[in-house]
Regions:
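Intrinsic disorder/low-complexity segments
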Residues: 24, 29, 449, 482-485
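Bacterial N-terminal signal peptides that target proteins for export
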Residues: 1-10
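Ser/Thr/Asn(+Pro)-rich, low-complexity disordered segments
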Residues: 25-445
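Short, compositionally biased serine/threonine- and acidic-rich segments at solvent-exposed termini, linkers
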Residues: 445-452
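C-terminal outer-membrane/trafficking sorting elements
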Residues: 454-544
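Bacterial N-terminal signal peptides
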Residues: 9-19
Length: 544
């Protein structure tokens, strides 16, 4: 839960862990130092994803799969960070940063920890209770640390990463089958009815010391939408369908800086659920009444966040069209706090890079320039081992020293969804997710199901190459809505054209081309389709 992290700094003083981060595994290829200055967009996005993955690989205990909440020496595990990390491993396999076998082994180790860890109502020595998990765990013992709460939202984010991994490892291989069975067992053990405590909605937390006392009910709008979807879809301990109306009862629909949408000032609330669930083209009753989707809602929130920065009512240094993005993060004054806008919430001039970066599927036309601006203008102080540091305040010349797992995770996942949609595509196919959406009364949106203002509106279409990663050759399919000139080319991560796959007038309809890897070194490439003013890019990985 985001609201508990302000306690982190004080607790860390009295809870130092003496072991450092595990050494970088030899199975990974080191990208080497990155020079500051201009990068192509593909290179910048690739660097952001790679460094985010490195966080989850290096800041983990390989013996149990737990991931540190933050990069600080002595940090406990955040189970939400573990969930983000499981998806990061799947993405890394597609990029060739870790082999499928090594990545699967790490995931199986993680699943074993959460399946076999002791459950119970005791205050110590357990990993969770009623199939749910404590927010923070000791990195070595994998049991509750501090007086951490049994956190429903952090459990849901953990489960989301597990489900994504389950969907990724989809072959008949015995280890893939074992992985899928473990995920099903862990997810279906969760007693979501217990988490409701006989109330109308899902409670935020529980502790052995006070039970549900002091913990409120999750009421929207915020990051907990995915929690309700998973709890509604459980085949073993589901919550009643009526809980969705409890969730929507707190919605604040208003207009901010020219955008009308469900308001929640920190951008993480518009991102977390969307990391895994594809809300394009579907609506619940509330969104049917408003004529948009939750995806479009997040797009509007993103645009409003930028407009707030342009208006800059607080007159903070640097704010403008290419420097924006407020969310919960480290802070030079308060240690850790939920910044947000609009309306302004705890805004003191602190920008959090994950706020813009993790909004890239919603509004790439404003996110990508912001990422370039942050890298080019502030890179010397802002960019380090794991990419952009957690936050910075230009007016105070302050840069955070830490990286946070729950801020790194959305970066790698949302960039991947922007480029390939792969996480969305596999996650929505899980039966529990489909059931949860159905029980929440989601229906296909009117018309095409994709709003014209969305960057993924129907028109020029480009499919992911098959297979990906590929050896030798792959097939790329694309659809041209009307006859016209078409250009399809392959670029390396430095933005250099290395293959021309199509360049001429083509008829409307579907076209297939062969992509040969002959003469090219292994690595990540981008292929770009352009026609009649539209452009789409996707990533592919060549293995030798």
């Amino acid at each position: 839960m985001r609201r508990h992290r302000a306690l982190y700094g004080l607790a860390l003083v009295v809870a130092l862990w003496l072991a450092g981060a595990p050494a970088r595994a030899s199975s990974l290829t080191d990208p080497g130092p990155i020079a500051h200055g201009s990068l192509t967009t593909p290179a910048l996005l690739d660097s952001l994803q790679r460094t985010a993955f490195d966080y989850f690989w290096n800041e983990a205990n390989p013996s149990n799969g737990l991931v540190k909440d933050r990069s600080t020496l002595g940090s406990p595990c955040s189970v939400a960070a573990v969930g983000f990390g499981l998806s990061a491993i799947c993405i890394a396999i597609d990029h060739g940063w870790v082999t499928r076998e090594v990545g699967r082994d790490r995931i199986l180790t993680t699943l074993d920890t959460f399946w076999n860890g002791p459950q119970g109502s005791g205050a110590t020595g357990t990993i969770g209770h009623m199939g749910l998990f404590y927010h923070f765990l000791d990195m070595n013992t994998a049991t509750r640390t501090w007086t951490s709460e049994l956190s429903t939202i952090d459990t849901a984010l953990l489960f989301a990463g597990m489900i994504d991994a389950r969907q990724y490892f989809d072959t008949a291989d015995s280890l893939d089958v074992e992985l899928r069975d473990l995920v099903d067992a862990i997810v279906h053990r969760a007693n979501w009815e217990f988490a409701r405590n006989f109330g109308p909605g899902i409670r935020m937390g529980w502790t052995p010391e006070t039970g549900f006392g002091g913990f409120g009910t999750w009421v929207g709008y915020n990051e907990a939408m995915i929690l309700y979807i998973l709890a509604l879809g459980s085949p073993t301990h589901p919550v009643p369908a009526s809980t969705w109306f409890t969730w929507t009862s707190g919605y604040n629909w208003s207009t901010q800086y020219g955008q009308t949408y469900l308001v929640f000032p920190p951008l993480f609330g518009h991102q977390y659920s969307h990391c895994w669930i594809d809300f394009r083209g579907i609506q619940d009753f509330f969104m049917v009444s408003k004529g948009i989707t939750y995806f479009e809602n997040s797009r509007r929130a993103t645009i409003a966040a930028r407009e707030y920065s342009i208006a800059n009512p607080g007159a903070f240094t640097g704010y403008g069209p290419n420097l924006w993005g407020l969310t919960a993060s480290d802070d030079p004054i308060f240690g850790y706090i939920a910044h947000g806008a609009p309306p302004a919430q705890n805004d003191n001039g602190t920008i959090t890079p994950t706020a813009a970066a993790s909004s890239i599927p919603f509004a790439p036309e404003i996110v990508i320039p912001a990422l370039h601006h942050m890298y080019d203008t502030y890179g010397a102080g802002l960019w380090s081992t794991y990419g952009f540091k957690d936050a910075f305040n230009p007016g105070l010349n302050w840069y955070a020293t830490d990286y946070l797992g729950i801020d790194q995770g959305p970066i790698i996942i949302m960039i991947e969804n922007y480029l390939t949609g792969s996480v969305w595509n596999r996650f929505n196919e899980y039966a529990d997710v489909a059931t949860g959406l159905t029980r929440a009364n989601f229906v296909p949106a009117a018309g095409t199901g994709v709003l014209p203002s969305s960057p993924t509106a129907v028109g020029l279409q480009l499919a992911q190459n098959v297979p990906n990663p590929f050896r030798g050759s792959a097939t790329i399919s694309y659809t041209v809505p009307t006859s016209g000139h078409v250009s399809l080319a392959l670029f390396d991560v430095l933005g250099r054209r290395v293959r021309t796959l199509a360049d001429g007038v083509e008829a409307a309809g579907r076209h297939d081309v062969s992509l040969s890897g002959e003469g090219l070194p292994s690595g990540v490439y981008f292929y770009r389709l352009e026609s009649q003013g539209e452009r789409i890019e996707k990533r592919c990985t060549l293995l030798k």
